[in-house]
Regions:
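Conserved Rossmann-fold NAD(P)-dependent oxidoreductase catalytic core, especially the SDR/UDP-sugar
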Residues: 233, 248-249, 364, 368-427, ...
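Strand-loop microenvironment adjacent to phosphate/nucleotide-handling motifs in alpha/beta enzyme folds
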Residues: 271, 276-280, 428, 432-448, ...
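Proline-aspartate-enriched helix->loop->beta-strand connector
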Residues: 203, 207-209, 308-309, 354-363, ...
């Protein structure tokens, strides 16, 4: 009933405003009472027309379909425009029926109505805020004091929502902004207190509990710098996601999330050439191996955005394929998807799949990737990473697949691990396949991805949750990192750029010290490193390097048209000799013998297996 009465009440109020404004305009325009009386009689005869015209125009301008508690400049423009149009319409009708009043009366009426109607809406907004404050007055005696970093549009919208819905939980003390012209000024009734350099002092002076970073369009490097400043305080850190993460482009408190390690990387979102990517994926049947894995599942999601005809999700583990299928059914219910449980080493099965579905694009993400684990079973690494790639690549060529993209790793460069060496051989095989096939074969090489299964971040989080210690193999160990979506998007972009035979190298930015990463994660979890949570150095594991390389120094890279993608200059190999060596190594089962054969195939492979003897 309330939802029917409220609009009716607003219409009645507007009617009163229209009549009052018309009468006021008469007495403002004419000082002579006799003249005023004459036009007053004419006005009274026109009041039904004036009221009807104004209400219809207000309805057309949706003045009765707005939530006035959020009223701003857009609503003010609508009120002004509606009253101008209403005045012109009323004047036109008056001329038509030959009862026109002086033109100044229409102008005065419109001007007064802007004040009356605008004032009534402002009253609704103030009243709504007052009621909301009254509701929360006694809910919480202790409110979290908040600093908002970013006195821009996002910060203003966030403050309005905090004042509207979270007034009993958070109290915004002020804004932080690097624009010094804003300092000392007020935005949405809240003062801009200083720049990022003042955060630590202000947090201490005002006893701030939480710092919210509300700068969704700012580059990742700047966000990283601000986070590092905020980490010096004891405040809880939350952040609005980047613009590319906000689906509707609106700002909401519900979108606030804790600052995570990904934010500390300071990496900017990838700029895809969507036209080029869509050109080779749109309307195509796309097969993805390892589709249930961290990278494979994200490639599935990114490909789905490009409107393929059909997605073939190939994986050995039924649970992971089931999970990605469930996600895709929710996100893309109309897209054709086929879950396929298969081992990439099973040539007969893979051939049957490609023969039946006839994929045009293949992303080969299936692989054994855990470095220490593969040191203990090198023969299994060879069969999965080398034989699996050989089977998929040869079958793709046989069925004339248009584009074949293999996911590789920085560990393939001057490898010290079995896993890295097997991936280097897989790269070599894919390159050779390109020379004797109509299929465009390419490999894409990148470093560690944050949050992938078995990676260091999930391990650290588990260790922190258990109270520590957090284990780091070496205090000086460094790794390249990027986020899973970033890696997957660049893989798609590399596929669009492929001419055939390239080994693409992704720009991983600067390497990150794992020890620093552990400290940051402990701090972000609300603990003090080596006080609340111990960091324990355990020593290098089998096959590990202190530093990873994305390309060998003697070979170098070439630039491409994309700033984050390069082409590695890699020496050619003899296909027949490589085929023979692969056949030979597949016959070997004893670990040390497999390693010796790997060294023969990849002379730059320097095994680091001392830890196996301990």
């Amino acid at each position: 009933m309330r939802y029917l009465l409220l609009p009716l009440l607003v219409v009645v109020l507007d009617t009163i405003c229209i009549i009052s404004a018309a009468f006021f305009s008469i007495y403002i325009r004419f000082e002579d009472t006799a003249i005023a009386q004459k036009y007053l009689e004419m006005l009274i005869s026109q009041l039904p027309i004036a009221v009807a015209v104004h209400l219809v125009v207000y309805f057309v301008f949706k003045l009765y379909g707005r939530v006035w508690r959020y009223a701003g400049s857009i609503e003010l423009v609508a009120i002004v425009a509606a009253n101008i149009v209403a005045a012109l319409s009323w004047y036109g009708i008056s001329i038509y029926i030959d009862l026109a009043l002086p033109r100044s009366l229409y102008i005065f009426t419109a001007s007064i109505l802007v004040l009356f109607v605008g004032g009534s809406r402002l009253f609704f907004r103030i009243y709504s805020c007052f009621i909301n404050k009254s509701k929360h007055k006694f809910i919480s005696s202790k409110k979290d004091k908040v600093l908002i970093v970013g006195a821009g549009d996002a910060g203003a919208l966030l403050l309005r929502e905090l004042n509207q819905y979270h007034i009993g939980k958070r109290q915004v003390i002020g804004f932080i902004d690097d624009d010094k012209t804003k300092i000392g000024k007020y935005m949405v009734g809240t003062k801009v207190l200083g720049t990022r350099d003042d955060i630590a002092v202000l947090a201490d002076n005002y006893e701030i509990d939480e710092i919210i970073i509300a700068m969704p369009s700012v580059k990742g490097k700047n966000i990283k710098e601000i986070i590092n400043i905020c980490k010096k305080t004891s405040c809880k850190l939350t952040i609005l996601p980047g613009v590319y993460e906000i689906i509707e482009g609106s700002v909401s408190v519900s979108q606030l999330r804790p600052v995570d390690v990904e934010d500390l990387l300071g990496r900017d979102p990838v700029e895809l050439d969507n036209v080029a990517v869509a050109k080779y994926l749109s309307g195509k049947t796309v097969l993805i191996t390892g589709a249930g894995g961290s990278i494979g599942s994200e490639i599935v999601r990114q490909v789905a955005k490009m409107y393929p005809n059909k997605l073939l999700l190939v994986g050995k583990g039924e649970n992971s394929i089931y999970e990605i299928m469930q996600d895709m059914n929710l996100e893309y219910p109309q897209l054709k998807k086929v879950p396929i449980i298969a081992d990439v080493r099973d040539e007969e099965r893979i051939n049957a799949i490609m023969d039946y579905f006839k994929p045009q694009v293949v992303f080969h993400a299936a692989a054994h990737k855990h470095v220490p684990l593969m040191e203990y079973q090198p023969a299994e690494a060879v069969r999965n990473n080398i034989l699996g790639t050989k089977v998929i690549a040869e079958t793709a060529a046989k069925h004339k697949v248009e584009t074949f993209v293999m996911i590789s790793t920085d560990k393939a460069v001057n490898p010290t691990s079995v896993m890295g060496c097997t991936k280097r051989i897989a790269e070599m095989f894919v390159q050779r396949m390109n020379k004797e096939s109509s299929t465009r074969f390419v490999a894409v090489r990148f470093g560690n991805v944050l949050g992938s299964r078995g990676s260091v971040i999930p391990l650290f989080k588990k260790q922190i949750a258990k109270g520590g210690p957090v284990t780091v193999t070496d205090a000086e160990m460094k790794r390249y990192f990027m986020t899973i979506p970033e890696a997957s998007q660049l893989v798609l972009q590399a596929g669009a750029m492929a001419k055939g035979g390239e080994v693409f190298v992704l720009d991983m930015g600067k390497p990150v010290r794992i020890y620093d990463l552990a400290k940051d994660l402990i701090k972000l979890s609300g603990f003090i490193p080596d006080k609340d949570i111990e960091i324990k150095i355990t020593g290098l594991r089998p096959g590990e390097k202190l530093f990873e390389e994305l390309l060998s120094a003697e070979d170098g890279t070439e630039k491409t048209t994309h700033s984050k993608i390069f082409i590695a200059k890699i020496k050619d190999v003899d296909k027949a000799e490589l085929q023979r060596q692969i056949v030979d190594i597949l016959q070997i089962t004893e670990g040390d013998a497999v390693v010796r054969k790997l060294q023969e195939i990849v002379p730059t492979y320097t095994p680091n297996r001392d830890a196996l003897k301990k």
